[in-house]
Structures are given as C-alpha cells and as structure tokens.
From Swiss-Prot:
Recorded superkingdom: Bacteria
Record protein name field: UPF0262 protein Acry_0160
Matching InterPro entries: UCP032146 (IPR008321)
Similarity comment text for this entry: Belongs to the UPF0262 family.
Length: 162
C-alpha cells in the first residue's frame, strides 16, 4: 500500500514493545531488536488510513496469542488498535530464529563464507517479512518497505522462544 514512500506523511515518534513476553533474547536477537528500534526512530513512514498526517506512538505486543498494533497519538491516547492472527508469520519467525542461531554459530566458529551466506538469507527473509507485514496491514496502515522490514524484526523479537 506504500508505492510512494514520499506520499506517506505520518510517522512513528516512538515504538514501545511489550516486555512481558516470556523468554530472554539471544545477544543477536537483542542487537537486531535494538537496531530496528533505532532505525525506526531515525526514519520511518507510518500512517493510519484514518489519520494520515498523525505523528504516532506504536505499542506492539502479543496478547492472547495475537499480534497487537496499538497506535496512539502523542498524548498516548489510542487512535486505533489492530489485531492480527500470528499464523501467517509463524513459519517466517521460526526461519528467522534458526537463521540467527546459525549466524551465531558461524560467528563463533569464524566461518566468514558461512556468515555471508546466512546474512544474505536473513536479508531475503526480512524482505519477505516486510511484504507480509505490508499485506497484513493493507487498507489500515500506510507504510514504506523499510519501516515494514523493521517492524518484522520487532514482531520476531516478540515471538522469541521461551
């Protein structure tokens, strides 16, 4: 829904993750999550269809097994809550976690060629995840591809293994 990122006038001021999800992040997952949040803070295009110019705060969580996008205004009042079934994301999240585990092993073993191959696979999976995020939010949220990629990373962090 975001063919022209320049046309998307809204943006996220901040992203808040539900930290009450069980299980600790691996160092690689933590680094990915922190990088995604920093990148979103620096540059993003995100607008509700009903509030196309709003600067918003996104509270991202998993509640009752569902992915919740609680989009709020700058006064922290909910503008819209979007609830998505996690099913379409499950296999990508599982693949992403396996890639991160493989990456950590390759780094520990110093296998540069393997690290590069895994990194290419990870970029491809991020792209697929971004497309899925955009498809699932189509008609509700306008966002650019880079914002969708970063949100996919955060979705994976919320669904970490216990």
């Amino acid at each position: 829904m975001a063919d022209g990122a320049a046309e998307i006038r809204g943006r996220l001021r901040r992203v808040v993750l539900d930290e009450d999800i069980g299980g600790a992040l691996s160092p690689m997952q933590e680094a990915d999550r922190n990088q995604a949040i920093a990148d979103l803070a620096a540059d993003n295009r995100f607008a509700l269809g009903t509030h196309p110019d709003a600067v918003t705060i996104l509270h991202l969580s998993v509640q009752d097994g569902r992915l919740v996008f609680d989009v709020r205004d700058e006064a922290d009042e909910t503008l819209q809550t979007l609830v998505l079934a996690p099913g379409p994301f499950r296999s990508m999240i599982r693949d992403y976690q396996m890639l991160l585990d493989s990456y950590a092993t390759a780094v520990a073993e110093g296998r540069e060629a393997r690290i590069q191959a895994i990194d290419m696979g990870r970029r491809g999976l991020h792209n697929e995840g971004a497309e899925l995020v955009m498809a699932r939010l189509d008609g509700k949220v306008l966002l650019d591809f880079d914002t969708a990629r970063r949100l996919f990373t955060l979705i994976c962090a919320l669904h970490r293994r216990a």
